[in-house]
Amino acid sequence: MQLNKLCNIEDWDRDARAATMRRILPYLPKAHTEFPKGMEHRKHWEFAQILDGLDQLNALPSDGLVLGVAAGHEEVLYDLTNRVRWVFATDIYGIGAFAGYEAAHTMLQDPDSFARCPHNRNRLVVQYMDALDLRHEDETFDAVYSLSSIEHFGAEAGAMTALDEQRRVVKQGGIVAFTTEVIVNDAPSLDVPDLTLFRSEQLADMCQRLPGLELVEPIDFSMSDRTLANVTTMEQAQADAQRSYVAYPQIVMELQGRQFTSVAIFLRRTA
């Protein structure tokens, strides 16, 4: 399976990918028996791509330690407790733009209340921590991951600082995996408060400049015509969310003339 790639609707055609989504989001097939068919959402893809990729790279030993950066209370955290010895969830819980929903302060006191998939509650540690200053020792973790987070850390400089911190705390030979937003049309990059949309060339260059990290494979930035056939504006998505509605497929988004989607990137620590 290609790991470093854009989200494409054809990824939902793989039975193994559908099985991962159904495992980590069990409440969705209960309500929609055909899930994920007909409910193609890039966030579900991010979850599954990271989990399947870490598994493919043998980065989840049974006695391993995994760190989630800016992890909120996403299902990936809980699913990983079934695979490794310890999972550390870190975020600025209760503070910032996501405090009201994805990073609620109550996650620090009662992580069980956010669990929506089977998990081992004795293997999850939740910590308040800034992604730009990870308070862990060097070479602690077998894998470090973040999901659609680095684009919120203060443009390219903040993203690079965060990824270098992740490199520092992962073991030699360990994996740093992340998803972020990448522009798929010819528009320039975008920096607005709390959000950066990267150009593919910019993101590839950033990965090449990260000291001590190497891509596990080249990044495939190709996107199918079938995927590009449906574009949802951010304004429409936000309006739909107000009435608890999602227009599927929700893979390619548009903001200020930039069409963008999710990309997954896996790097290995080499130094």
How would you name each of these model-derived features?
Residues 173-181:
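Conserved beta-strand signature within the Rossmann-like core of class I S-adenosyl-L-methionine
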Residues 145-152, 181:
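Short catalytic micro-motifs in class I SAM-dependent methyltransferases
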Residues 67-68, 74-133:
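Class I SAM-dependent methyltransferase SAM/SAH-binding core
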Residues 187-222:
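Conserved Class I S-adenosyl-L-methionine
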Residues 2-60:
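Class I SAM-dependent methyltransferase Rossmann-like catalytic core
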Residues 222-271:
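A C-terminal cap/extension of S-adenosyl-L-methionine-dependent methyltransferases
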Residues 129-144:
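A short acidic, Gly/Pro-enriched loop at the edge of an enzyme's catalytic core
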Residues 153-165:
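A short, conserved alpha-helix within the catalytic core of class I
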